């Protein structure tokens, strides 16, 4: 059971035309295309928001690292 051959694809296409009609098929294809376009757009926006969050986290961490490096070290040893 591999890929359908050309005659099988033609039979499937004929059944689709009979079920939906020739006028409805372009509308279905247009709806499918716009759905895919919206899905890709949402995926791209999600990736961009993750990148911006990561950049803002790095910017917030940078000043914290500078403060810890500049604080003096206290002597905590006990003298006898």
Swiss-Prot record:
Location of the protein in the cell: Cell inner membrane
Cellular component terms per the entry's GO annotation: TAT protein transport complex
Location of the region described as Disordered in the Swiss-Prot/TrEMBL record: 43-80
Domain of life: Bacteria
Any GO MF annotation of the entry: protein transmembrane transporter activity
PANTHER family: SEC-INDEPENDENT PROTEIN TRANSLOCASE PROTEIN TATA
Function comment: Part of the twin-arginine translocation (Tat) system that transports large folded proteins containing a characteristic twin-arginine motif in their signal peptide across membranes. TatA could form the protein-conducting channel of the Tat system.
Protein name: Sec-independent protein translocase protein TatA
Gene that specifies this protein: tatA
